[in-house]
UniProtKB/Swiss-Prot annotation:
Gene that encodes the chain: rlmN
Keywords annotated in UniProt: 4Fe-4S, Cytoplasm, Disulfide bond, Iron, Iron-sulfur, Metal-binding, Methyltransferase, rRNA processing, S-adenosyl-L-methionine, Transferase, tRNA processing
PANTHER family, per database record: 23S RRNA METHYLTRANSFERASE, RADICAL SAM CORE DOMAIN-CONTAINING PROTEIN
Co-factor binding comment: Binds 1 [4Fe-4S] cluster. The cluster is coordinated with 3 cysteines and an exchangeable S-adenosyl-L-methionine.
Protein name: Dual-specificity RNA methyltransferase RlmN
Domain Radical SAM core residue range list: 121-365
């Protein structure tokens, strides 16, 4: 009997509630921020305006101190400071690769840790963020998959990773200064720790904040969500987020994908392709990215390349195929395909008319490359009662 991957998970999301009882405004939707402001003394008629002002200070200017919000009355600033706070994850370690890649280990509520990676390139700067502490999917080639799932990240902890990186890059604009169109952090990829679609609501709320035109102001075309194939949530992603989609495909037969990406036992290749075919039209995306890690003797044959093309053509999916040389980690059960084999695989796809870039490995000297992320301090799964005790809830 085959093992079914779960549709939902036995995992809790811990809200960011500080010991003194103040509410963290980071991660709240505009509607929720309006509610909490009214609950703590903001006149209802002023609440929408106040949300707009505070929102810009937090997400456009990167301000964390209410006293610095100079377009608010001094008494109101004091009132805000009494009831609210502006908190983001704490950076524990920061490693910089020889190629300029930065890897951050950040601490969140309960003492848990996640990893975040910034990858600078000539024409862009990409931040790879996490959505869960650990992961439940146990993809056999992925280092994160060896770390037990502890919990989902809150919307504050997800968008807080973006804010933390902007802090480190010194990229918050200064009010009144000339606008600089050059952005060091121009793209977000949800390709860090965890399966984003198993934490849909928090990921959606965080990305809505990142895309807000009065805040961080990233276009949805600059945000890519990578999923292993949580089929029921793919349509929701198109409708409610509308960002670009990448699929961790990695195999062309169910037999191999069941091993590499075990969620395939729940939603097989045909079910996945059917869901992917509808995504571009609903989300207005030009194409879907197929991520394909190259494993020596496992999924890298010419026959695999032709099967991959057959899948894409059969479902008429506008696609780009990202070929990823396997980044080895201690105890990994696979080896990287040879450069010649990867190039031959890419050439078959390219000759068929599809883009097939070979991803340049970045940050592997600091274990920041694709598939290498894992918290330095690993935590086992905890019960809701244990987590609540840790966080003082």
């Amino acid at each position: 009997m085959s093992v079914k991957a779960p549709i939902t998970q036995d995992v809790v999301t811990i809200p960011r509630k500080l010991p003194e009882g103040r509410i963290n405004l980071v991660g709240l939707t505009r509607d929720r921020m309006r509610e909490v402001l009214i609950d703590h003394g903001t006149p209802e008629k002023q609440a929408k305006m106040r949300v707009g002002q505070i929102w810009q200070w937090i997400y456009q200017w990167g301000v964390r101190d209410f006293e610095a919000m100079t377009n608010l009355a001094k008494a109101y600033r004091a009132q805000l400071a009494e009831h609210f706070t502006i908190e983001i994850p704490e950076v524990i370690t920061r490693l910089v690769s020889e190629d300029g890649t930065r890897k951050y280990l950040v601490r969140i509520a309960g003492g848990h840790e996640v990893e975040v990676v910034y990858i600078p390139e000539e024409d862009r700067g990409t931040l790879c963020i996490s959505s869960q502490v650990g992961c439940t999917l146990t993809c056999s080639f992925c280092h994160t998959g060896t770390q037990k799932l502890v919990r989902n990240l809150t919307a504050a902890e997800i968008v807080g990773q973006v804010m933390m990186a902007r802090d480190d890059l010194g990229e918050w604009p200064v009010p009144g200064a000339p606008k600089d169109e050059t952005r060091l952090l121009s793209n977000i990829v949800l390709m860090g720790m965890g399966e984003p679609l198993y934490n849909f609501d928090n990921v959606r709320d965080a990305m809505k904040i990142a895309m807000d035109p009065e805040g961080i102001q990233l276009s949805r075309r600059r945000i890519t969500l990578s999923t292993s194939g949580v089929v029921p949530e793919i349509a929701r992603t198109a409708e409610e987020i509308g960002c670009l989609l990448a699929i961790s495909f990695h195999a062309t037969t169910d037999e191999v994908r069941d091993v590499l990406v075990p969620i395939n036992k729940r939603w097989n290749i045909e079910e996945l392709l059917s869901a992917l075919a509808a995504y571009p039209k609903v989300s207005n995306s030009e194409r879907i990215t197929f991520e394909y890690v190259m494993l020596d003797g496992v999924n890298d044959s010419d026959a695999d390349a032709h099967r991959l093309l057959d899948h894409i053509r059969r479902y008429k999916i506008p696609a780009k195929i990202n070929l990823i040389p396997f980044n080895e980690w201690p105890g990994a059960p696979y080896k990287r395909s040879s450069n010649n084999r990867i190039r031959a695989f890419a050439n078959i796809i390219y000759q068929a008319g599809y883009a097939a870039p070979i991803r340049k490995t970045r940050g592997d000297d600091i274990m920041a490359a694709c598939g290498q992320l894992k918290s330095a301090t690993e935590r086992a799964r905890k019960s809701k009662k244990q987590i609540e005790a840790e966080t003082g809830l």
